[in-house]
């Protein structure tokens, strides 16, 4: 079982409540295979991987928001292209 100390992660995020929200959001992305881990998995669960990514400064709320915005923009662009093809 992996032992993770969250003190470094708390310092990266700001407070423990935001850490919980950020780690849960990232763990959900990893669990649903919506994103690839940024650290070696080492047979760890998604929550542990998320905490390790946060601790190393690879993930935070702003980064996840930017990634989500890019995905939504890409989907919107694809939908607009499909509508343009239909209306031609």
Curated annotation (Swiss-Prot):
This is DNA-directed RNA polymerase subunit omega. It holds the Pfam family RNA_pol_Rpb6. It comes from Haemophilus influenzae (strain PittEE). GO terms for biological process: DNA-templated transcription. The lineage of its organism: Bacteria, Pseudomonadati, Pseudomonadota, Gammaproteobacteria, Pasteurellales. The RNAP catalytic core consists of 2 alpha, 1 beta, 1 beta' and 1 omega subunit. When a sigma factor is associated with the core the holoenzyme is formed, which can initiate transcription. SUPFAM superfamilies: RPB6/omega subunit-like. Promotes RNA polymerase assembly. Latches the N- and C-terminal regions of the beta' subunit thereby facilitating its interaction with the beta and alpha subunits. GO terms for cellular component: DNA-directed RNA polymerase complex. The keyword Transferase applies. The keyword Protein transport does not apply. GO terms for molecular function: DNA binding; DNA-directed RNA polymerase activity.
